[in-house]
Amino acid sequence: EALKIGGFTTGLFKNGIPTLIGLYLFCSGATIDVKAAGETVYKGVLLTALKFFGGFGIGLLLNAIFGEAGFLGLLPLAVIGAVTNSNGVIYATLAGEYGDESDVGATAILTLNDGPFFTMIALGTAGIGKFPITAIMASIIPLIIGFIIGNLDHEWRETLSTAMALLPPFNGFCLGAGMSFFTIAGAGFSGILLGLLTVAVTGILTFIIYSLIRRKADPMGAAIGTVAGVAATTPAAIADADPSFAPQVETSSAQIAAATIVTAIVTPLLVAFLARWSRKFNEKHGLGNAKQQNTGVKAMMAETE
């Protein structure tokens, strides 16, 4: 109640989610470099596509089987909102540890899955939600403007990329102010389940697909098996565009918040394990250069059978 006194206090700590999400998207867009090298863009686009279709596919499947009630309390809004959105900070850290410069550079492309844009596309395509074109455009325009400014002025890019780290705590505060303790406690099991589902679909499964496409075992395919903290604000943004989702916002947000913590713990451990396994696998089968790629595909297929 203390946060409802109005003015700047209410605006920042209670009703600030739309503004903070827009600012986060603006900063994210500024980090995308139009001059990025081909390998960086290739990896970034591929990982973004795998993340989106993984979340879209599992969300569509669960909705078709269990309907709006969800699977073991997991709502379709929470599943799609979480699984399609990766934690860029964790990915960048893992890329710096187990990848190369192009993997680190792909982080900027992965920022495209920040915010509600892909979730709206997935829910709308699946027929689960109805979003006016203006709402869809409004969810991506801040990122586009940030992209333009970041590429016109590199100093602004550096400033805005640094500012991204300041925003998640404020997002979390606004989000928590709209939840009850019982909702958070009740999301415990389903939130853990959502986190493990995210790791399974966009961690383990994407590692296999990414490695087959790359024609060598590549642990970075599993590094997108996370849920970004900002994803917890996606249900509120979705409900603003389609009020029919309003009853699901509180529960979905709590589930996504719990999944964020689970994936932040599990995914780095998974990537560390897969990095060791991949190194041994690639050395065993002589992978790593173009002349050996076809052999590598056959070897990976044989290893997984």
Predicted regions and their residues:
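Hydrophobic alpha-helical transmembrane segments in multi-pass integral membrane proteins
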Residues: 57-64, 119-128, 174-188, 231-253
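Transmembrane alpha-helices that form the ion-translocation and gating core
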Residues: 45-86, 192-244, 268-278
